[in-house]
A protein has these predicted regions:
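Juxtamembrane transition segments at transmembrane-helix termini in multipass membrane proteins
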Residues: 2, 7, 56-68, 104, ...
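Generic N-terminal leader segments that precede the first folded domain
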Residues: 1-74, 81-85, 89, 93, ...
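Hydrophobic alpha-helical transmembrane segments in multi-pass membrane proteins
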Residues: 34-55, 80-96, 132-157, 195-222, ...
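Hydrophobic, aromatic-rich alpha-helical transmembrane segments
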Residues: 24, 28, 32, 73, ...
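Long, highly hydrophobic alpha-helical transmembrane signal-anchor segments
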Residues: 57-80, 116-136
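Hydrophobic transmembrane alpha-helix segments characteristic of membrane transport
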Residues: 97-126
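Interfacial aromatic "cap" segments that immediately flank transmembrane helices
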Residues: 14-41, 115-144, 156-209
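Soluble non-cytosolic domains of exported or imported proteins
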Residues: 11-14, 92, 96, 155, ...
């Protein structure tokens, strides 16, 4: 199927944010289906597990016996922590898959094409391992930079910001995609940072609105019954993930293509070649899909 495609021309910061919003709105149904199919079951697991464990009131436990053995006090929390760890890992993997699948949808839109959510999920699944590796490396690198000094962390995060788009669209390994992002953003640091800041401010606003509604419902539920008062909060968090994750992918995709237009004169011919590679139809000069997730290459490669 074909639809109107975004313009392949240099964009201002405001135009990038506006373009991301328009991309998100144009492909809203497909993007939400992707996020709901992946993240919905994870949220359901979280709800069922938390409901099965039940609420744990630490303050009441300590008041009943202030001199109790700490291990006895914290023992009821162990199942809760295990559930939180499992759902956190699943949420991370799910969010990464949603990002990759969303980028696939949005990249095709630049050629005026619309693909279904099933096809995009297959593309995201094929690129999941290198996406996970890249996300972990970027988080570690940026996190270390933020710990020692705020500026290096922000710098690294910005320079690596289009790694997911490069990884999915050009079928690169994690390390090569990070290097590709660095090359593309070099010389455009401030505009890219500005676009990212504006997009994350929008993300925060939407999250706060949904979270505020969920918190209000939680308070009302707690007054009625403590047993399931946690449900609105968990559901609210899931809705935030489903709604917001594709928008972040939209912003990353817009920035990525803007950089390629500016630096490489990116056009429809090059895009067609990229999309063929993304779908695995063009095997020239490419390693087998899923190989070399770190992007290091074989010992004898040049």
């Amino acid at each position: 199927m074909y639809s109107s495609r975004p313009d392949l021309r240099p964009l201002t910061v405001g135009e990038m944010v506006d373009g991301a919003i328009r991309l998100y709105r144009t492909h809203f149904t497909t993007l939400i289906k992707i996020a709901a199919v992946v993240l919905g079951p994870i949220a359901l697991i979280d709800v069922i597990a938390t409901a099965a464990i039940g609420p744990v009131d630490m303050s009441t436990m300590l008041l009943v016996d202030p001199e109790a053995n700490p291990m006895e006090v914290f023992e009821p929390l162990i199942p809760l922590y295990v559930v939180l760890m499992i759902t956190s890992v699943l949420s991370f993997l799910g969010s990464t898959l949603v990002q990759g699948a969303s980028i696939s949808v949005l990249a095709h839109s630049y050629r005026g094409e619309t693909i279904d959510w099933q096809t995009s999920l297959k593309t995201g699944a094929r690129r999941l391992v290198p996406l996970v590796v890249a996300t972990v490396l970027i988080s570690l690198g940026s996190g270390i930079g933020l710990v020692f000094c705020l500026v290096p962390g922000i710098y690294l995060f910005t320079m690596w910001s289009v790694t997911p788009a490069a990884l999915v669209t050009e079928r690169l390994g994690a390390i090569r995609a990070m290097g590709r992002s660095f090359d593309l953003v070099r010389g455009r640091f401030w505009p890219v940072l500005g676009a990212l800041v504006l997009s994350y401010l929008l993300y925060i606003v939407v999250s706060q609105i949904i979270g505020g509604v969920a918190s209000a419902i939680t308070v009302v539920s707690a007054l009625a019954s403590d047993q399931f008062s946690f449900l609105p909060s968990v559901i609210g968090s899931a809705i935030v993930q489903v709604v917001a994750a594709p928008f972040v992918a939209s912003m990353v995709t817009i920035i990525y293509f803007d950089l390629r237009v500016r630096k490489e004169g990116y056009d429809l011919e090059l895009m067609t070649r990229d999309l063929e590679r993304m779908e695995g139809n063009d095997r020239r000069d490419l390693p087998p899909a899923g190989d070399d997730p770190f992007g290091l290459g074989s010992p004898g490669s040049r």
